[in-house]
Amino acid sequence: MEKRNIRDHKRRLLATKYELRRKLYKAFCNDPALPSDMRDKHRYKLSKLPRNSSFARVRNRCISTGRPRSVYEFFRISRIVFRGLASRGPLMGIKKSSW
């Protein structure tokens, strides 16, 4: 596994760990019914959470090459690896189309 994939995996774990807390703080920050000092307190708590605990920093990567672009989510591999595996035949149910 590449270093980038390991880093992305750690980000995914952190994001799931802090997901509920982050959503709660965001809801309190955006609630206009609360007093401004209470919203500021929750905004401060939100800023103190780890950066990598945000789902915006998670990126889908190919599990074999670590490529971040053009990754098929169902297979978790890039289009280049997918084409090679599909032509060789180890992907079940995938075959080259012809008409």
From Swiss-Prot:
The keyword Repressor does not apply. InterPro entries: Ribosomal_uS14 (IPR001209), Ribosomal_uS14_CS (IPR018271). Gene3D superfamilies: 1.10.287.1480. It is found in: Mitochondrion. Keywords: Mitochondrion, Ribonucleoprotein, Ribosomal protein. SUPFAM superfamilies: Glucocorticoid receptor-like (DNA-binding domain). One of its GO terms (molecular function) is structural constituent of ribosome. It comes from the Eukaryota. One of its GO terms (biological process) is translation. The keyword Mitochondrion applies. GO terms for cellular component: mitochondrion; small ribosomal subunit. Belongs to the universal ribosomal protein uS14 family. PANTHER family: 30S RIBOSOMAL PROTEIN S14 (PTHR19836), RIBOSOMAL PROTEIN S14 (PTHR19836:SF30). This is Small ribosomal subunit protein uS14m. It comes from Oenothera berteroana (Bertero's evening primrose).
